[in-house]
UniProtKB/Swiss-Prot annotation:
Disulfide cysteine pairs (residue numbers): none
Annotated organism of origin: Bacteroides fragilis (strain ATCC 25285 / DSM 2151 / CCUG 4856 / JCM 11019 / LMG 10263 / NCTC 9343 / Onslow / VPI 2553 / EN-2)
GO BP field: glycine decarboxylation via glycine cleavage system
NCBIfam families in alphabetical order: gcvT, PRK00389.1
Pfam families attached to this UniProt entry: GCV_T, GCV_T_C
Family (UniProt): Belongs to the GcvT family.
GO molecular function annotations of the record: aminomethyltransferase activity; transaminase activity
Entry keyword annotation includes Membrane: no
The protein, known as: Aminomethyltransferase
One GO CC term on file: glycine cleavage complex
Record's keyword terms, sorted: Aminotransferase, Transferase
EC number: 2.1.2.10
Function statement: The glycine cleavage system catalyzes the degradation of glycine.
């Protein structure tokens, strides 16, 4: 299994470790619910060094990105970030990702750990524009410091005014005595906070500084288990569950990152435009349980009469709401807010209702 610069630290701290995307990663420390609430109410730290990072540079960088991504990269300026996806030729999604505009002809792509090799091969094989591509996935470490107290803790470690970094923007500067750290107002939790990118040799210095700065706020290390419950409470999609090679961005409710602007002829644009105009055969919805039960990936969604209408893609017990919540694809006629549906949980039909995420208000 691959490791991150923090793997030994996780083991020393007693984390429950498990393989994820080929990496030995911490799943939980004190427990998923405790960690979830720590992030919602205070500050927690996630090792997300397993994520992939590609640089796209040169005079052809923008043309390349306009072709392979769904969002309008031309709308970015240096210091801004965009959520987007790589559409494939069959109407599905290769991956969802973030695009950082670093300089006028320099972009950073941050991709899912499970898709690094697939995404890299996709970029290489579609680079007919001649953009300069560089895979820096093994040369970057990343911590996500999340929660309402994150800004107070991190402000102690930099002269950059973190209040001047709005959501989905970033600055590059000195942090904890290390130069060229990317400080990004992003996250996968809905609790606020920052993501830090730095060289692996600075990893332990930055970890120790962050935990020292956050001690007065009860800072804790957080595992991937709580990362999943936090993102699901916000209704954020997870690749491999809610998105995959067969789900289109229009079906997944990602029309807002699919921009049909003049001159942007991205992969499979015409099919996605047709879907936007004519509708899709299924839609991703959020739902919460009426009956007691925890929905899980793969459970069937049915009508009260037992007719199959879809499938659960993500589900959990909400630590905040203390009810079962989930997402899944249903036939469009069952996607309206307030529609009652059923989840087939091992032969038991349990009632749920379609709602608009986030589940955590």
């Amino acid at each position: 299994m691959k490791t991150t610069p923090f793997t030994e630290k996780h083991i020393a701290l007693g984390a429950k470790m498990h393989e994820f995307a080929g990496y030995n990663m911490p799943i939980e420390y004190s427990g998923i619910i405790d960690e979830h609430l720590t992030v919602c109410n205070g500050v927690g730290v996630f090792d997300v060094s397993h994520m992939g990072e590609f640089w796209v540079k040169g005079p052809h960088a923008l043309d390349f990105l306009q072709k392979v991504t769904s969002n309008n990269v031309a709308a970015l300026v240096p210091g801004k970030i965009q959520y987007t996806c790589f559409p494939n030729e069959d109407g599905g999604i290769v991956d969802d990702l973030l695009v950082y505009q670093y300089e006028p002809e320099k972009y950073l792509l941050v991709v899912n750990a499970s898709n690094i090799e697939k995404d890299w091969n996709w970029c290489i094989s579609h680079n007919t524009e001649g953009a300069e591509l560089e895979n820096s996935s093994d040369n970057m470490a990343q911590l996500a410091v999340q929660g309402p107290k994150a800004i107070q803790a991190l402000q102690k470690l930099t002269d950059i005014n973190l209040a001047d970094i709005p959501y989905y923007t970033f600055k590059v500067g000195e942090f904890a005595g290390e130069k060229n750290v990317i400080i990004s107002n992003t996250g996968y939790t809905g609790a606020g906070g920052f993501e830090l990118y730095f060289y692996p040799d600075a990893a332990m210095k930055i970890w120790d500084a962050v935990f020292e700065a956050g001690a007065e706020f009860g800072i804790k290390p957080i595992g991937l288990g709580a990362r999943d419950t936090l993102r699901l409470e916000m209704g954020f999609c997870l690749y491999g569950n809610d998105l995959d090679d067969t789900t289109s961005p229009i079906e997944a409710g990602l029309g807002w990152i699919t921009k049909f602007v003049d001159g942007k002829n991205f992969t499979n644009r015409s099919m996605l435009e047709k879907q936007k105009a004519e509708g899709t055969v299924r839609k991703l919805v959020g739902f919460e349980m009426i009956d007691r039960g925890i929905p899980r990936h793969g459970y069937e969604l049915t009508t009260a009469e037992g007719d199959k209408i879809g499938v659960v893609t993500s589900g959990t017990m909400s630590p905040i709401r203390k009810i079962g919540i989930g997402m899944g694809y249903v036939k469009p006629e069952y996607s309206k807010i307030g529609t009652e549906i059923c989840i087939d949980m091992r032969g038991r039909k349990l009632k749920a209702v379609v709602v608009k995420p986030p589940f955590r208000k």
